[in-house]
């Protein structure tokens, strides 16, 4: 499994190139193509928040933000992904609460259904307007293309019930996990858990003291 971690300074546009890169020695197994890339806002203090919330669904991102309602990832994979996220967040000191309780952070996840789709934070409102105030993210942002089918995108942002400056929300952490769908249920489940765990391993700045 390949790993990459970057901090936000100027907007980062290179994750797509990383994910599209060829395996240096030639892939023998599907798992050889796995990539986990993470980025974060280096100015954000992740030790301050104590609570988070997340939706209970994971949309399939098709490249058409007008699709309503969006298709959803199948329940079994959704449950595995969200439970793994909860376990990782709990292990580093964050407590999950209902969104109505006013969490410090909100985490959303999406899975790509198509290849060669361009992903921008600004389109996230399309998928989460029912759950989270619909404001586009502002730089630092990630704009990438050529993710592969089955890539899992995980975003973290501060939660607010008030209108943010310039009507824009600052994203503070993103994980991009390629290779969560191969057609083999048992293999996919292992790769999902390993990929999410690796995203947290390579993000040591996350967590409370």
Question: What do these predicted ranges mean?
Answer:
Residues 1-12:
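Bacterial N-terminal signal peptides that target proteins for export
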Residues 18-21:
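C-terminal motif of bacterial Sec signal peptides marking the signal peptidase cleavage site
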Residues 23-43, 145-155, 160-172, 177-209:
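C-terminal/domain-edge helix-coil "capping" segments
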Residues 32-65:
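Compositionally biased P/S/T/G-rich terminal and signal peptide-adjacent segments
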Residues 44-46, 69-81, 99, 142-148, ...:
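Extracytoplasmic/periplasmic, Sec-exported soluble proteins
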Residues 49, 89, 102-106, 147-151, ...:
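Extracytoplasmic
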Residues 54-114:
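N-terminal segment of the mature soluble domain
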Residues 109-164:
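Surface-exposed short loop/turn segments
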């Amino acid at each position: 499994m390949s790993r990459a971690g970057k901090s936000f300074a100027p907007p980062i546009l290179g994750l797509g190139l990383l994910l599209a890169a060829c395996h240096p020695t030639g892939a023998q197994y599907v798992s050889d193509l796995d990539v986990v890339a993470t980025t974060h806002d280096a100015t954000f203090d992740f030790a301050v928040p104590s609570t988070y919330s997340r939706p209970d669904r994971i949309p399939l991102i098709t490249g058409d933000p007008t699709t309503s309602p969006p298709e959803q990832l199948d329940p079994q994979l959704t449950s595995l992904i969200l439970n793994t996220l909860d376990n990782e967040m709990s292990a580093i000191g964050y407590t999950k609460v209902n969104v109505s309780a006013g969490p410090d952070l909100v985490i959303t996840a999406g899975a790509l259904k198509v290849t060669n789709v361009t992903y921008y934070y600004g389109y996230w409102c399309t998928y989460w307007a029912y759950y989270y105030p619909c404001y586009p993210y502002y730089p630092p942002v990630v704009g990438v293309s050529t993710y592969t089918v089955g890539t899992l995108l995980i975003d973290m942002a501060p939660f607010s019930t008030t209108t943010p400056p310039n009507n824009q929300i600052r994203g503070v952490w993103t994980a991009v996990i390629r290779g969560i769908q191969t057609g083999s249920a048992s293999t996919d489940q292992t790769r999902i858990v390993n990929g999410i765990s690796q995203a947290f391993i390579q993000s040591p700045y996350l967590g409370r003291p």
